[in-house]
Amino acid sequence: GLSDGEWQLVLNVWGKVEADLAGHGQEVLIRLFKGHPETLEKFDKFKHLKSEKGSEDLKKHGNTVETALEGILKKKALELFKNDIAAKTKELGFLG
């Protein structure tokens, strides 16, 4: 797994991704399909795309993927925040 510091780096970058989930998700899928064409076999509706950039379905699916990832990252961000607050309150003597 990632260290807390590595998670923080991911979360710091996520703000840029979050601004355009659908666009970034579409780009991730395009790169996946170009770099690993065999993965297209898992996606019947994308097998015969003529133009990935112009595909509204691909953009929608990219948004779905990025939204799911966003949920995971926000959960981790909350966990890191909670741990940080707990450590600070203990450091200040508020916890036994």
Curated annotation (Swiss-Prot):
GO BP: any one term: removal of superoxide radicals
Reactions catalysed: Fe(III)-heme b-[protein] + nitric oxide + H2O = Fe(II)-heme b-[protein] + nitrite + 2 H(+); H2O2 + AH2 = A + 2 H2O
Family annotation (InterPro entries): Globin, Globin-like_sf, Myoglobin
Residues binding O2: H61
Residues recorded with modification Phosphoserine: S3
Cellular compartment(s): Cytoplasm, Sarcoplasm
PROSITE patterns: GLOBIN (PS01033)
Pfam family, any one: Globin
Gene Ontology MF terms: heme binding; metal ion binding; nitrite reductase activity; oxygen binding; oxygen carrier activity; peroxidase activity
Chain residues that bind nitrite: H61
Domain (Globin) ranges: 1-96
Keywords assigned by UniProt, alphabetized: Cytoplasm, Heme, Iron, Metal-binding, Muscle protein, Oxidoreductase, Oxygen transport, Phosphoprotein, Transport
Any one of the GO CC terms: sarcoplasm
First-tier enzyme category under EC: oxidoreductase
Enzyme Commission code(s) on record: 1.7.-.-, 1.11.1.-
Annotated positions of the Phosphothreonine modification: T64
Family as reported in the entry's similarity comment: Belongs to the globin family.
Function: Monomeric heme protein which primary function is to store oxygen and facilitate its diffusion within muscle tissues. Reversibly binds oxygen through a pentacoordinated heme iron and enables its timely and efficient release as needed during periods of heightened demand. Depending on the oxidative conditions of tissues and cells, and in addition to its ability to bind oxygen, it also has a nitrite reductase activity whereby it regulates the production of bioactive nitric oxide.
Quaternary context: Monomeric.
Name this protein carries in UniProt: Myoglobin
Species annotation: Ailuropoda melanoleuca
Source species taxonomy: Eukaryota, Metazoa, Chordata, Craniata, Vertebrata
